[in-house]
Amino acid sequence: MTDSAPHSAVAAGLATVTPAGTVLDTWYPEPRLGVPAGARPGTTRLGALEISGELGPDYGGLVRRDESRGVEVIAVRTVIPDLAAAPVDTHDVWLRLHLLSHRLVSPRSISMDGVFGLLTNVAWTSAGPVEAATFNVHRLRAALGHVTVFGVDKFPRMVDYVIPSGVRVADGDRVRLGAHLAEGTTVMHEGFVNYNAGTLGPSMVEGRISAGVVVGPNSDIGGGASIMGTLSGGGKQVVSIGSGCLLGANAGIGISLGDNCVVEAGCYVTAGSRVTLPDGSVVKAAELSGRDGLLFRRNSVSGALEALPRTGTWGELNAQLHAN
């Protein structure tokens, strides 16, 4: 269950580090909120006896040097005393990403300030993470045989670290670690969920949920639909979608939707869009942000973008598709 006001967190995990000390990843199998009294803030390397006590007897064999990848896997304990403060290092960021994907915290409830500057560009391979700057696929294949490179990025696939209960993810490449997928969520092949974003209840995701975006229960993000984030382009609107909403195929929004709203297929509503109301007045879409029960559509005769009170129903989610 998501903690709406988390304060601190602790976890033991396995980190992949280079000879220069660069942290490529840290896997925390069982993160938890709250910090034991007297716990030392930051990340501490665990000794052989501590590994069994904190991670379990099966994890000791995973601590090793891997010459083929040029890395060492070490056991660590990370303590974050204040989740409202910005992350201080790479381990700190990785624990926060795990907290989100384990659904221990909800998107936007903890600080993720400065995460890009603390993460390393990594080649994510079937043999494990490799530093992108020194990656040599020929050397790796010579040592290990066939190796698949899934991508080169600072964020890995969520499914390689966390598989939340009660969800379907048709294509693991489309969901980043740090995504928050509520039980009953289905992410289809063309859906995408960024870190510090996601769903709060059963949802159909066939479009893009950008960083910082939260989608309420029983909402449908249609195929090719786009929800604007704030990572680039100067956007300042923090977008959320309420419960029971439909964002139609190839539609898009740069404003928040309240509950029970519909955006017609192919209709894009940015914060600065001029919207005609039923009384003939025209307002910026930002003035309608977060309101319940609206239908946004493009008038097929005049071409004007309109907002009307909702009537009827869009059909709602198919319960059989979300019994995961």
From Swiss-Prot:
Role summary: Catalyzes the conversion of the cyclic tetrahydrodipicolinate (THDP) into the acyclic N-succinyl-L-2-amino-6-oxopimelate using succinyl-CoA.
Source organism of this protein record: Geodermatophilus obscurus (strain ATCC 25078 / DSM 43160 / JCM 3152 / CCUG 61914 / KCC A-0152 / KCTC 9177 / NBRC 13315 / NRRL B-3577 / G-20)
GO cellular component: cytoplasm
Chain's gene name: dapD
SUPFAM superfamilies (UniProt xref): Trimeric LpxA-like enzymes (SSF51161)
Biological classification of the source: Bacteria, Bacillati, Actinomycetota, Actinomycetes, Geodermatophilales
Cellular localization per UniProt: Cytoplasm
Name listed for the protein in its UniProt record: 2,3,4,5-tetrahydropyridine-2,6-dicarboxylate N-succinyltransferase
Superkingdom of the source species: Bacteria
NCBIfam families cross-referenced by the UniProt entry: DapD_actino
InterPro entries: DapD_actinobacteria, Hexapep, THDPS_M, THDPS_M_sf, Trimer_LpxA-like_sf, Type2_DapD
Active-site residues from the entry: E206
